Amino acid sequence: AVKTKKIMLGFGILELPLHNPVRVAIQTALLDNLSQGRLVVGTGRGSNYNAYEYVGFGTTTGLGAAQLDEAEELLVKAWTEDNVTFKGQFFDVSFPSVRPRPYQKPHPPLARACTSDASLVEMAKIGRPVLIRGNSINATGEKIKLYRDTMSAAGFSEEDVEKSLDQLWVWREMHIAETNDEAMNDFLPAHYKAYEHLEGVRAKWNPPEMDISIQRAPLGPSDYVEAPNPDISESMVGSYKRVAEQVALMRDAGVRNLMLTNRGLVSTEKTKKSLTLLSEKIMPSFH
């Protein structure tokens, strides 16, 4: 945070039902000051794929939505108010203030992870930034249009709508190499292995009595053809030319910000090469 000057810092996501929101307020306020206002705080209930995480913290996924709403309310109060007394269903706290206050006023962007259209509409109605994941490019564009239209219908000004769209982030897995074949050979086996590991942990630890979601299996190698397909949920994988085409398609669909990760066990050397290609071959065309 201190050594960098331009890069944004963020959480994608903090599963707030599994955290103490006052501690989160203290830690994020400090980080926002150290970075001089480059922090985005992404929050969410977490995934029903990983219900075992809730069990590990002594709670259940069924309480997650209510815990998230209450934790976010307390987080904002801790960031912005003095002499806080909060009595909720899950948190009962009193404290004089959080110091330092966040660098950004009134507080860092608080973006909610949204999977369903219903949760997206809920956030749009109150002008909250959102994080979107796991859709095709065309479906992502439809979600962004829904978000924009809902904010406008709720009475927000065009300036407010544009500000929220500037803080809307879309998550994708990414790996770039010199050629499509090289990128696929680097990324896909590691990606599938990571998926199999997660499925194994879930099968062993997820409690059967909880509401468990089944994660869709990743696309197979034959789904990745020479040109990107905006109608399927493909990762951003390929040569820098192919990935640049994907970025252009996402830009045209209304995407302004991307969160790019690589959760497979790709080597450090190849991951660094991927990031270098991103910064040198792709990013200059989209600034």
Give residue spans per PLM region.
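Alpha-helix-loop-beta-strand connector modules within alpha/beta enzyme cores
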Residues: A1-F11, Q67, A71, L275-H287
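Acidic (Asp/Glu)-rich catalytic clusters
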Residues: A1-K6, T28, D32-L39, M123-K125, ...
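Hydrophobic faces of well-ordered beta-strands that scaffold small-molecule active sites
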Residues: L9-G12, L39-T43, L110-A113, R128-R133, ...
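Active-site mouth loops of central-metabolism enzymes
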Residues: G12-V22, Q104-T115, M174-A177, N229-K241
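Glycine-rich, proline-tolerant flexible connector loops at the mouths of alpha/beta enzymes
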Residues: E15, N135-I137, L260-K272
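Flexible, glycine-rich active-site loops centered on histidine and acidic residues
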Residues: P17-T85, F90, P129-I132, S136-A139, ...
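Conserved, mostly hydrophobic/aromatic
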Residues: L31, L75, L110, M123, ...
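An alpha-helical appendage that flanks or caps ligand/catalytic pockets
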Residues: T61-V98, A139-V255
